[in-house]
């Protein structure tokens, strides 16, 4: 019933044709927006209306024109007329017969016309015939009369339809050369359907359903001959007089302004139009019909009219005005006012081409004329304006000046295409940026793409006309390039000259280019040789060759030049030979960091310039080679005709530029286009390709501030199809979530700024129209709530509408597709939104048949529905629709839910196989399919059908496509997949969240892995830096479940590769079906959930899970699966290493599916398939090695013990090792990349020695057969080394050193790191933490016991390894545990996991426990802990319990005298932040009161164990509560001697002494410091410094303590003191009292300097003291130290000056002392040769240094020590150019006695510094670091008032302001501390005597 009602309404015309208001409410007629519910609608009864009119190409007039030309090519001949005649004048008369009101005629005349033609010609040659073009009409009579009136006898007539020529044959030589003739015809022609051109008819239907006809003409290129006999070629220009006899009820139009018609019998009218100017025949036009118009008169007084048919009047004004303004601006630009009195724009219901440029009467397809603001978007409006401006440009380029023949068609169409956008910028100046971007998008990019297609042809095309992308888009792009080369003004001057010269005639390319050459010459425009530019020569390779240049732009030098080269974009071997050999002279407009303003360059076609001096020639024609420091860009104006590809380094620099400073939209667009098209080029050539660079670029571009705030439609439109290609790969699979994440990554910021309303900015509004539907499809931002609310408002506004939604929708047309999409997608199942839209669609196709935009928006919106039921309705609509099936089914391609519904619908309706829509249907259904499962699904459908051959071919095509896409996804797309994981998904977490509902225990993993890194084993390029693997995990299920959740991250697999088996007692595998469609990844948790089919329950039993997958290797050092590169071997070649680190980041789940939590310990059976020339290492020893012939080898490893997944390790590479065996026979090896193993001997000894200690001390043998230490050339920045069980992996400098260059710090760092990781083999590997918040169970133990491992290995270093390290751990822990916002508990969920607390505070607390429990009890408790929890997991509670048992066994009591409970004791220390400060206060004169408070001043309290040292004893007491808990101990008389609480820094606390207690300690130190240990002395210095720094003490209280240092001889105290001395020397560097401070330092250290001098002895503590003393005394200008430095330096120069192997052997100076020697020796030298020597030696290290420590940094630092201003400036310039690293800035600054070298250099070189290849903050930090005077502060501020300051960008200004804050802070420090500090020095040391 509903269908009949709708059809009835259609026929009786109750709806107006084009309506903007609702029809009156009719009884019984339901409004489409009345309330309803989806569940009440019978889906099978829903019926549809279908539109009767829809343009085939609604948004692209050029496609319409191309379609027209293709149709015409079926009957057009290109046979040319002989050059016998010259056309002078035509008089034409036409009477058309077509249905019109009141007109009657014989039926046989219907859709014909009568015609009379009188043609005046001049004979150019003698002949026997007159030959003209004529086609498809009947000639009734003809006559030829010469100029004198003499009739020329015509003996016969010949009409050849093949050549479309008519010959009137007279006597021999009857046609006399030079004679003028009139040739007259009377004939009858055909009025064709609109598809056939000539005179054609079309029609429209009025609201009452009546059909109204109209006629018009379409003559281009060869159809004038269908209308009248003629010389129908462009070059035969003539004048035309046209008369039309037409139905009096109609309107007649032609090229010229109509005159008053003459009526005949009130039925017919006759009108004669004024004679035309000279013009080509194809431009003649007339039209007759019921036309109406809107008018506009422009500033040139030209009348422009927009014509339509009745009912369209209200939509024509925009066209009239736009046309008038385009005409005016074109007249202004060309300097030639439009020569006709009127310009008509006639819109027809049907027109084969989008538009036709007939002079004065342009005919269009209606949508380019009628602008309906209720349906049409901004993009539709601009498209109409563009088409009009295109056709109006033809009035000059094509009509006024016409191409001589169709080979130069670009002279018509190229100009029109160029000006259609260019001239709009003058019409709509506020939209200029948008329009210019459209020109690059729609002209340049389309032209470049067309020029490399298989059907490409030269721009000048003898086989023309070619109405295609070459002619239009390449032609327009040539003009854009010429404008850029000549300059806009010169180009305009040249175009004006061309038009003036060639007006009313015909032109070819030579005419244009020669005119431009003359103009260029008169304006002194030069070419690449510096000669006057010859435009003709320049353009020849562009117009006569296909293809375009590929410009390779190499900018990979640190400071060197960028270089260019060119080649044809396509392989030259596939191209037809040309005289230019596919080379071009390429104009480039470039900019770089040093030349930010664009400048012109040429990349010449060939070397050599004639008639020029050879030197000048070489200079002028050399390829561009500009200084390229950091970034450089070319084609800034996006005018170069070619594609530019940047090398990887240059590309990265451009990315950095875009991030920092942004670029214009056109450059963004061209960069994206060039990257994508280059990728396609490489793909076609079967070379490595990928989307990664494109994606990197897009990521940066779409997150720039400019795009975020003002999004560019053109940039988005360039990128979106590429993004869609990527989306297509993943939309239907397990990684479908990648697609919305990708769009959110790129566009979330832009979306957040969109207002969801029109802005009057076309760019933003068009972007909104195109982008927002994607935002809805991909759930960006608040689209769900917003679109649902907006559609609710639409529903409310249209509740009474009977005419659809266009007129009543309150929202912009730009937003409607998104609103409808959101309503369809997000509406709840009970909503009627979908059906409201469907009803609206049914009404819109009747209400607005010509304005299709609204009903198409409704269709596209409905395609977003996720409901199978409503999708089924939509599919039924589509399969019956009259619309283009590719368009409407194409909507469903973006909806992943649609494919299965399409499949099921086809299965239920197999008759669809006979539909003409079969191809489009299958295309949409399989568009996103790319899996083995989908291929089988499609084959199943195919096999159920009986197919014809054509149907079989269609199915076969899509089966092959699915198969190829599946293959592509798993091969070539691997790099893209890797990029998506790197950028869309969290790389890793430290730690990951716990995975809930893990019911598996005792996992046993079998991993077979192939590692694809460069080596002897071949693999496909797309497999590079990947691994392929199969993993089987056998496990015990402990509780019922219907799904398995396992950790897996960064792994690519097809769910169908997963197998699940039930393992029974007989070890038989029983397969368990898996629901592959519901296998789901959780990227944020790093898990995959595998459900059983039909939710089958898995009961407790043993199961195995098999997965085949591919994973990704980070190409830089990182956590997870990573790679290393190095240079090594005999040829110093690059090598690759595969390595793992699973403690942080991606975790082991990135290598294999596993239960990746520490508590899920399992065993691992690992087999690695790797290049044969490499070695594979893992946790266990290798047990089998199989070598294959193809360069690959399999290494199988023994099964591991039970261990946590994060300890699994692999290393593959070219390795060598040193080995030894421990006391118990453990094989110990240190591995390095080949050639470096010699430097690992020290680490090998530490490894073995630490194993021996751990085994012996804890009575727990190392359980593995071997322990390997792998020293890598690179390692993750997040860690130094990793304690994998049996295979320690870390950065090389932590395991190796070169003894010729290694300082004591270098050596001890190797010892400490190695021992630390070995200790982990017990604490972390054998016993493993239960969860990551207990990480101190690993790291605290390793940080504590490594000292004992070193001590066991090197007992002679006890003073350093034990004494110094124990103090240092406490020192660092206390330092950071009192910083708000930084400090956190040792046991904490607060990130980061790996911070100061678990390492240093954890170590300090273990030291505390060792002291409280006693070493023996602590040892016993830990041995028990290891034994009890070995191979399982432990918590802090387990540790405390083991220690408690040991403590109580030995009767250790707590603060209450009760058996000590370690947990109660340690919880406050491990679960709370900060530490206790015990403050001693003098009550009265003789009583000391102690109280406790937190360092961070909160209410936290601890039970503090304190060892108290007095002259006669060392006592132990507990301090509890606030006051200590025992007044006998803590409320005590003032001691007669000294009393040190916390002696030996045995507790984790600080003691704040009262003055009297403090000075008794100080007195003791002055009299006999050795009564206190070095640790105690260092602790006192550390505490005193802390109390002074925190404001609790006066500075002098701390300074008094330093007096005892005159006798100090231990490392820890000196390190504390010298850190303070160095700070003071730097603070006072520019204070006038600096000598006073220097004297203080020299006097305090005098005795120590005398004792230690410059003597090193191999004892680490001694050698560090020497280093510290030498450094600080040279800084303090100690004359003796400076003299020693000079002497050693002179010897050094003498010995090393000519060294060709570095300085390690020749120096003769201990590495600890080289930095001060080189620095202060060179500083005192007056010999410039010494500077040269140091500089040369530094340069040698830069060129030749390997991986290990060298003197390079020492020598570089020395260069900065010189005081020669010229040398300083030279070095600063070299830093800016990249010759020296920016670290030299710091050396120059700290050694600059004047303080202003960097500042003055900044004043003189501001721009260069800002452009330097390093961050501005480095310069500012170096410059201001020691400034502290009021003058310096004012000087720093003065720069802000200079003009140079304005050169800084916002970020740089902030950096500078931070620098001023530093100076201000330094100055404020002086205000507080300077006076008391100096007075104290004066008091104790007197005046300086240096």
Curated annotation (Swiss-Prot):
EC number: 3.4.11.-
One of the GO biological process terms: embryo development ending in birth or egg hatching
GO molecular function, one term: zinc ion binding
Top-level taxon in the UniProt lineage: Eukaryota
A GO CC term attached to the entry: membrane
Keywords of this entry: Aminopeptidase, Differentiation, Glycoprotein, Hydrolase, Metal-binding, Metalloprotease, Oogenesis, Protease, Signal, Zinc
Sites where the protein binds Zn(2+): 390, 394, 413, 1316, 1320, 1339
InterPro entries in the record: Aminopeptidase_N-like_N (IPR045357), Aminopeptidase_N-like_N_sf (IPR042097), ERAP1-like_C_dom (IPR024571), M1_APN-typ (IPR034016), Peptidase_M1 (IPR001930), Peptidase_M1_aminopeptidases (IPR050344), Peptidase_M1_dom (IPR014782), Peptidase_M4/M1_CTD_sf (IPR027268)
Record: glycosylation sites: 110, 534, 581, 785, 803, 914, 1024, 1094, 1245, 1451, 1521, 1826, 1841
Cofactor: record remark: Binds 1 zinc ion per subunit.
Pfam families in the record: ERAP1_C (PF11838), Peptidase_M1 (PF01433), Peptidase_M1_N (PF17900)
Cofactor(s) listed in the protein's UniProt record: Zn(2+)
Signal peptide as annotated in the record: 1-20
Reported phenotype of the disruption mutant: RNAi-mediated knockdown causes an expansion of the pachytene zone in the gonads of 31 percent of animals and a delay in oocyte nucleolus disassembly. Brood size is normal and embryos are viable.
SUPFAM superfamilies registered for this protein in UniProt: Leukotriene A4 hydrolase N-terminal domain (SSF63737), Metalloproteases ('zincins'), catalytic domain (SSF55486)
Binding, substrate: 220, 354-358, 1143, 1280-1284
Catalytic residues of the enzyme: 391 (proton acceptor), 1317 (proton acceptor)
Function as written in the Swiss-Prot or TrEMBL entry: Putative aminopeptidase which plays a role in oocyte maturation.
Entry similarity comment: Belongs to the peptidase M1 family.
Protein name: Putative aminopeptidase-2
Annotated source species: Caenorhabditis elegans
